[in-house]
């Protein structure tokens, strides 16, 4: 019998083992859909970003006007701009759900896949930050100034490092030009890193809600899960289209509709909503260097998850006390997001400090302690 082309062709064979004949646990829920929604978000960002880059001018005197020109004069330019801006928000919604699922069901025990995933999160955050600077509105300019200036907290090399990033003595034309370059190149670095993430995932196979070995109960990815993912694509793209057409500026900042000027500071400098939880942790530490370290650790703490997992059970499905603290962590992160968008005054300062302390406490102390306690109670 002639061999099936998808199993014999060198290129199609890779696609076949990754997306068609891939053995998949039958009991994975819709929480596993977010992993496949992320490449859709990435492709949408690259496609819209490419067309926007054709009309955008990375120059301080023209950047704001070029964005206005895209929205007013370019055919469907307003839609491209809105899809790109809101696409970033949907990207982060999918990322946070994907990480949340990984934490809940113990997916972090696939160490290589998890660590590459955390690196991907850092890359996506960096891309979102440099992309937010490009429209050159007030919040873009001051956000770039404040966040890049944090590097000056580094001992000895701090001020040199900041000037090296800026390309001068302040955020100016050189900064905007390099940020545009970074925004473009980082998307492709993310795409390459995603393939490595997928490669490591397919070495072990997917986990499942029970956290048990599922080798006895697997089906091929296509058609069962490919159609399930297709439903996710339709919902995601539909929601993105609705937001981008009916309420395109809902998640943006009004200050960014004012052209950047170094002569007046906005009343409250803050990043986009998806970075607010880390920004709140940064602000809750009164020392500059301490704040920068806390900001980095708020993401880096995810690297500790495979090390601090002390329970004999993988998934939180069978761990009621740990489950309660997982939801406490989610609530705490939402509180931090809210605090990051508030002015620096009481009671917001105190709430931010308590929430920041609790955030690290849950990751570093409470989760490993609960694992040991549950092992003892369950006698395993």
Swiss-Prot record:
GO terms for cellular component: mitochondrial inner membrane; respiratory chain complex III. The keyword Repeat does not apply. It is a multi-pass membrane protein. One of its GO terms (biological process) is mitochondrial electron transport, ubiquinol to cytochrome c. Signal peptide: none annotated. It comes from Glandirana rugosa. Belongs to the cytochrome b family. A ubiquinone binds at residue 202. Heme b b566 binds at residues 98, 197. Heme 1 (or BL or b562) is low-potential and absorbs at about 562 nm, and heme 2 (or BH or b566) is high-potential and absorbs at about 566 nm. The gene is mt-cyb. Its main location: mitochondrion. The keyword Ligase does not apply. It is found in: Mitochondrion inner membrane. It comes from the Eukaryota. GO terms for molecular function: metal ion binding; ubiquinol-cytochrome-c reductase activity. Heme b b562 binds at residue 84. The chain crosses the membrane at residues 34-54, 78-99, 114-134, 179-199, 227-247, 289-309, 321-341, 348-368. This is Cytochrome b. Binds 2 heme b groups non-covalently. Pfam families: Cytochrom_B_C (PF00032), Cytochrome_B (PF00033). Keywords: Electron transport, Heme, Iron, Membrane, Metal-binding, Mitochondrion, Mitochondrion inner membrane, Respiratory chain, Transmembrane, Transmembrane helix, Transport, Ubiquinone. Its cofactor is heme b. Component of the ubiquinol-cytochrome c reductase complex (complex III or cytochrome b-c1 complex) that is part of the mitochondrial respiratory chain. The b-c1 complex mediates electron transfer from ubiquinol to cytochrome c. Contributes to the generation of a proton gradient across the mitochondrial membrane that is then used for ATP synthesis. The cytochrome bc1 complex contains 3 respiratory subunits (MT-CYB, CYC1 and UQCRFS1), 2 core proteins (UQCRC1 and UQCRC2) and probably 6 low-molecular weight proteins.
